[in-house]
Amino acid sequence: KFKITLVKEIMEEFNYPGIRMMIEANLERMRQPFKIDISTDDAITPGAVEYKYKLMFENRSISVLSYNLETLLAEKMQTILARGLANTRMRDFYDVYEIMNSKADQISFDVLKKAFAATCMKRETSFGEEEVRETLDKIKDDSGLEEMWNRFNRVNYFVDDLSWGEVLETIVDNIEEIAVS
């Protein structure tokens, strides 16, 4: 049994807000909360990808249209640059690190560059080469962001012992490659 526990608007800062649905799945005495974000009018470059998920208790699959990896990365990289030192979303940093390291063989840098440009256009942001480097340098030098990372690391078991320096090395190298070159 599924129960929607909360629906709220997300991405209100953009012209195309979406919604986040908090859902609780119940099976006998098991309870599993999860969330689904639904947005419209995003710049998905080159297009949505169909993912098939096999159901646990039925012999069938369901299909979900979703972002491709390049668009997901482009949106997170744009957010990292746009928010700079004001970014409190450590999950964005973690996601970029994890995707770039675990799925690098599935990522097309040509598509990623196009997705980044499309995301910036959609979000009405632009970043010059000098601005990109300055923003990344400020992020690297900021002890407040490092402390937020350390807190994020402590409360999220999946982060393991990943250091802020390791995360930044991946982020800086990849953002510079797609946003500067």
Cite the ranges covered by each PLM segment.
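Structured mid-to-C-terminal alpha-helical surface segments
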Residues: K1-S181
